[in-house]
Amino acid sequence: IAMLGAVSAPAYAIGVEPFRLSLKHYHLTPPRWPRGLNLKAALIADPHVCDPWMGLERVRSIVRQTNALKPDIILMLGDYVASHKWQYDPIPPQAWADLFGDLSAPLGTHAILGNHDWWDDADAQLTGGGPTRYGQALLNAGIPLYQNRAQRFDKDGQAFWLAGIDDQLALRPHRKIKRHRWKGLDDLTGTLAQVTDDAPVLLMAHEPDIIREVPGRVSLTLSGHTHGGQVNCFGYKPAFPKRSVKSYAYGHIVETEGTKLARH
């Protein structure tokens, strides 16, 4: 039985799980969210596009199924590129970005970058800034990119803000340019300073780690990165990203401070 498990687990991880599309619905009422403001958001996180695991046909299928949900707004939460050795054919970024450009929602499609979208761009790692070629591909496809910026929207006669921060692990240590530690390019304070009224705020942040720094002004923080714990066997997560907090691995998390609800 132990040997069967040792063989079947990798087989499932390589041959089955990457080809499954997991669709999860949440019905939330975040704090400071107006009673009459009904917003249906579709979230796409961590597609890691590459052959054979996430080819263009799968991206096309995800776009089609997302559009079929008829969301009001579509939010893309980063890590569009695989950036690892377990692929036999990287896919040109404009090819998949153009497919994501076919996403359709009345309030549009909006994106942030993830750590792999920075790590896989050697020029961006050297210069310490963007635009990355993956971010540029999204812009070319007509998808606005949120790198420490906020934008106001109106729906059903009520306003809300969408904010997005740049990646918290964007720049790796780099001996050639004497960068000795990880460097994030996120600016939470500067991003939220762009919010000019008391309308509720949705915040896109690729890594969920920042939630403890997010002020109560934000109604809901939306993240990817954790892949539900990477490997999640009945709650056991042996391959969870070391820089992330395990309690933020999956689902809808409500943070509290003492007995007071603090943030979602």
Residue ranges and their predicted role:
Residues 202, 207-264:
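Conserved beta-sheet core of the metallophosphoesterase superfamily
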Residues 121-143, 155-201, 211:
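Binuclear metal-dependent hydrolase catalytic cores centered on His/Asp/Glu-rich metal-binding motifs
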Residues 1-32:
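N-terminal membrane-anchoring alpha-helices
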Residues 38-51, 159-169, 202-205, 259-264:
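Active-site-proximal beta-strand elements of phosphoester/diester hydrolases
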Residues 30-42, 143-144, 150-163, 254-261:
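Beta-strand-turn-beta hairpins that frame and shape the catalytic cleft
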Residues 42-45, 73-79, 108-115, 146-149, ...:
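Active-site neighborhood of phospho(di)ester-bond hydrolases with catalytic His/Asp-centered motifs
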Residues 47-49, 80-83, 115-119, 151-153, ...:
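Solvent-exposed loop/turn segments at secondary-structure junctions
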Residues 35-144:
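Membrane-embedded segments
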